[in-house]
Amino acid sequence: MKPTVVSADVLFEDHRATLKWEWVAGLGASERRFDEVAVSEARSGADLVGYLNYIHPYRVQILGEREVAYLSHVGPEDSARRISRIITLEPPVLVVADGQTAPDTLLSMCERAQLPMFATPESAAFVIDVLRAYLSRHFAERTSMHGVFMDILGMGVMITGESGLGKSELGLELISRGHGLVADDAIDLFRINQTAIEGRCPDLLQNLLEVRGIGLLDIKAIFGETAVRRKMRLKMIVHLVRRETLERDYERIPYEPLTQDVLGVPVRKVIIQVEAGRNIAVLVEAAVRNAILQLRGINTYQEFVERHRRAMEQDD
């Protein structure tokens, strides 16, 4: 599920420093929000901000140099008609960018209609980039999953499995081997675009890892700044299972790579059996290295199948 609400005052305050903007009209409409239907139907935050567009009134409408010229470099009646059309469509916010001065007619109509309008010296393209990234994060589909989320060799890896299999201990060993912790226990996952899932740690659990028998460990304080990450893209799920579960539910060597659906995005999945004497940390590292090879187009299993086929043909 994704949130469907962000108000004009929150949008303004969150970017006051970055965009150096001022609230020039419609200050009484600080609670004005995006149309909830438009938000729920938007494929990403990119659909919710753009240059002046009469066809998509639900967007944050950005007025750069050309848009301001379109509104002002005509006769008074035409200018008033064009501006009135914008006001009638009731966009959530208007932003005058490129250091442009808003026409007096636009200011007065926004004030009369209580339509929030911001003015910034930053370029229109920069404003659009910043707001698209912000709205993509804010309105992203989201969920929470149980496990340990790690940065292993630059790849975001989520370790899952039933309780008592040693996920946190595995995470601790991987940290001691130079990898980074993103989140332990609860992982907040966001679909930031159609093909990417981003994982973060809830603020309450930031930098913390719980190990049975020891308690809570502050990984940043113990191992240093480089041992923690603020967020990572989810690229792989390592699922820990007991031996009987592995033999019952999974093939030993699957012909097709396993995947797990997370917020509508298929994520590569690897099953690792937990058993006394097995070095799970090394196995996880090997699985990640193998996945990196596959991303480069090197598939060891397919190469083995091809080698086996050629050997059989030679025997015949």
From Swiss-Prot:
Q: Does the keyword RNA-binding apply?
A: no
Q: Does the keyword Nucleotide-binding apply?
A: yes
**What does the miscellaneous comment read?**
Both phosphorylation and phosphorolysis are carried out by the same active site and suggest a common mechanism for both reactions.
The EC number(s) attached to this protein equal 2.7.11.-, 2.7.4.-
Source organism (scientific name) = Polaromonas naphthalenivorans (strain CJ2)
Active site, per annotation: H146, K167, D185 (proton acceptor), R252
Q: Which GO terms describe its molecular function?
A: ATP binding; magnesium ion binding; phosphorelay sensor kinase activity; protein serine/threonine kinase activity; protein serine/threonine/tyrosine kinase activity
- Which family does the record assign? Belongs to the HPrK/P family.
Function summary:
Catalyzes the ATP- as well as the pyrophosphate-dependent phosphorylation of a specific serine residue in HPr, a phosphocarrier protein of the phosphoenolpyruvate-dependent sugar phosphotransferase system (PTS). HprK/P also catalyzes the pyrophosphate-producing, inorganic phosphate-dependent dephosphorylation (phosphorolysis) of seryl-phosphorylated HPr (P-Ser-HPr).
| Reported cofactor(s) | Mg(2+)
Q: Where is this region: Important for the catalytic mechanism of dephosphorylation?
A: 273-278
Superkingdom of the organism of origin: Bacteria
InterPro entries registered for this protein in UniProt:
HPr(Ser)_kin/Pase, Hpr_kin/Pase_C, Hpr_kin/Pase_Hpr_N, P-loop_NTPase, Ser_kin/Pase_Hpr-like_N_sf
Q: What is this protein called?
A: HPr kinase/phosphorylase
Q: Which one Pfam family would you cite for this protein?
A: Hpr_kinase_C
Keyword list (alphabetical) reads: ATP-binding, Kinase, Magnesium, Metal-binding, Multifunctional enzyme, Nucleotide-binding, Serine/threonine-protein kinase, Transferase
Catalytic activity, as annotated: [HPr protein]-L-serine + ATP = [HPr protein]-O-phospho-L-serine + ADP + H(+); [HPr protein]-O-phospho-L-serine + phosphate + H(+) = [HPr protein]-L-serine + diphosphate
User: What Gene Ontology terms for biological process does this UniProt record contain?
Assistant: regulation of carbohydrate metabolic process
Quaternary structure, per UniProt, is: Homohexamer.
Which EC class, in a word?
transferase
- Sites binding Mg(2+) sit at S168, E210
Q: Where is this region: Important for the catalytic mechanism of both phosphorylation and dephosphorylation?
A: 209-218
Residues binding ATP are G161, E162, S163, G164, L165, G166, K167, S168
- Written domain comment of the UniProt record: The Walker A ATP-binding motif also binds Pi and PPi.
